[in-house]
Amino acid sequence: MVDAITEFVVGKIDNYLIEEAPMLIGVKDDLEELKTELTCIQVYLKNVEVCDKEDEVSKEWTKLVLDIAYDVEDVLDTYFLKLEKRLHRLGLMRLTNIISDKKDAYNILDDIKTLKRRTLDVTRKLEMYGIGNFNEHRVVASTSRVREVRRARSDDQEERVVGLTDDAKVLLTKLLDDDGDNKIYMISIFGMEGLGKTSLARKLFNSSDVKESFEYRVWTNVSGECNTRDILMRIISSLEETSEGELEKMAQQELEVYLHDILQEKRYLVVVDDIWESEALESLKRALPCSYQGSRVIITTSIRVVAEGRDKRVYTHNIRFLTFKESWNLFEKKAFRYILKVDQELQKIGKEMVQKCGGLPRTTVVLAGLMSRKKPNEWNDVWSSLRVKDDNIHVSSLFDLSFKDMGHELKLCFLYLSVFPEDYEVDVEKLIQLLVAEGFIQEDEEMTMEDVARYYIEDLVYISLVEVVKRKKGKLMSFRIHDLVREFTIKKSKELNFVNVYDEQHSSTTSRREVVHHLMDDNYLCDRRVNTQMRSFLFFGKRRNDITYVETITLKLKLLRVLNLGGLHFICQGYSPWSLPDVIGGLVHLRYLGIADTVVNNLPDFISNLRFLQTLDASGNSFERMTDLSNLTSLRHLTGRFIGELLIGDAVNLQTLRSISSYSWSKLKHELLINLRDLEIYEFHILNDQIKVPLDLVSLSKLKNLRVLKIEVVSFSLFSEETVRFELLVKLTLHCDVRRLPRDMDLIFPSLESLTLVTNLQEDPMPTLQKLQRLENLVLYSCVYPGAKMFINAQGFGRLRKLKVIIKRLDELEIEEEAMPCLMKLNLDNKDGATKLMIPDRMRAFV
């Protein structure tokens, strides 16, 4: 992994040499030499890792290289921080002015020469201790293959609940049993790690039958640091909006009573994943009412004494191991997918490896993912390396081999997963923005950095290191990290000072990134030495906080690239509530600022100082004042409700803009927004003095890369005198006063896959809409017109899968027999039977 970090730093030197050349006065040659030395060391680093050199000399040598790499990054970033501050004071534009005062240049020159000496010393140690001699037989690591992942994207890679079909049927019956047998109200799923307890519980939780049967459904995970009070508070918070401060004041017994009162007389399902303590289980029994409403509780546990209590109301379900046949079927589907000819020798090696997986699904799928990337002539080498370590294959060994098999960018992406909380549903778009902001992703000739990052994440899915939660149209939307994988990434990240997950027991850290889950209070700052070289600080959770905590942290962290404070509420005496601390304006290296759901209601002027900012995530917040972001030319993603005027300069890099008023939109230079992909425009009625500007298709059609468009305004027309075409638009949502649809909508929107219309149509839209060849999802809502009749002919909607029609006074809906052959869901608002339905029998089951 040290080679990945070193390669990352070498890439950073390259970026500085290319983009900041005018600022590197007198140091360019020395920096080039340093880069060359580090590049040469790369070869030895890779060999040390691939050959599994674990002797003390090799470990110490790699640590020296890691320290140098981090120090190089510190020297460069600190130097440019000083230059930025000086230019800001002088009021100069950085790229057009060369500093005449060479004081800082001399300082960095001394630092670089020191680093060069240290690098040469490390190189000499290679020869002195023979670290560079690698003649023994070894497994050759493959590089990450970004484009090869494309071939796997068409396949759904969600984790299969292998061998658990019968288990799921049995437990589903017990969940839905309404025959008055209320003796069983808690199901305990028991088994060792890697058997699929969580997968089985989640399959039950997400079952359509379960969703329909239970009024309330709650899923909570018991993390390592979680106590019984935390479990109770999480369940309560999932059920109702309750102040966290109020809950914290309650004793455990009071929380039990409070939760009991909430759920009394309710039909609920509560799942508590990975419970370890009998005391916590007894508390849940007291808090969760066992009533006659058919409510159920599911727990998963690896602790037998927790699973097998004496309570007759608890049904314990033991998960079995996979049979060899089940394990082999699971393995060969993935491992042999791209091998054209599987000979007997390859099958023999594969079966020997599968036999050693011990019937554990997790171990088997990770092994299959690893072998799917290997050429047939490499299989024996992998099997030999696994047998050397142990008679049995442990999943941690497979994680290690998979990790070594990755290219350096994929390694960085994989280890970065350690920032997310346990059982967290990772939003792929957010992760992509974070990876780009960290500088881990390089632009490709054919793809944006975001597209490259997405392929890396798909690669992690392909090799079974993450578990898919949601896809839309094959596009990965979210995933989860298995506990064992998360433990591996946290351990590796800590070893490399890459990421530190805050623990109350440790008061300081030397890691480049720190993440805080749930807690940020006096304990966090008390006697804590903050690492001033930190590049990222991320907070996950929801908490009302004194603004001074954030000020204290950010005041010391001048080199931050990523600052995620989503969920914090900034409150402090002497400050107006709901504002950001001024010290954030001094973080000139910042690429990602996350302030989602922080109740911030204005963006201070200092935001314009953050001119390298790529992502500003302010979703969940509304800004009524004018917001000037015209200096942020690197901005790629902007989210928040910008009610007041929003000023954006020549934002050619902007890809996401959600959401902007129609007035502000009219003031922008649309022709410059060449990379905009996702756009939301609203008409905010809160500002009476704001001029309402009608929207038209012409201005929007200039956005040649637009994929997603949402418009919520009164005055909007789909008609245009000019010929317009939205070649790449796949999703369109219109909430406006549209009376008619243009007959050539299929020509205007040739790629449209999802359409939502909340309008006041005066005629049947189906003759027009059914010509949209790629449409798969259609929602018509609140469309009122007299004598309303709709007709879909036999050739209509060839690809439509979901149709939802919520129309007042719809008199008649006729669908011909052969129409919509792909339809899977039909939702009609016809409970009172007022609409005459003339539809095929096959569709009546959907209604």
Swiss-Prot record:
LRR repeats lie at residues 587-610, 612-634, 703-726, 749-774, 807-830. InterPro entries: Apaf_helical, Disease_R_plants, Leu-rich_rpt, LRR_dom_sf, LRR_R13L4/SHOC2-like, NB-ARC, P-loop_NTPase, RX-like_CC. ATP binds at residues 191-198. It holds the Pfam family LRR_14. The keyword Nucleotide-binding applies. Transmembrane segments: none annotated. GO terms for biological process: defense response; response to other organism. The LRR repeats probably act as specificity determinant of pathogen recognition. Potential disease resistance protein. This is Putative disease resistance RPP13-like protein 2. It comes from Arabidopsis thaliana. The gene is RPP13L2.
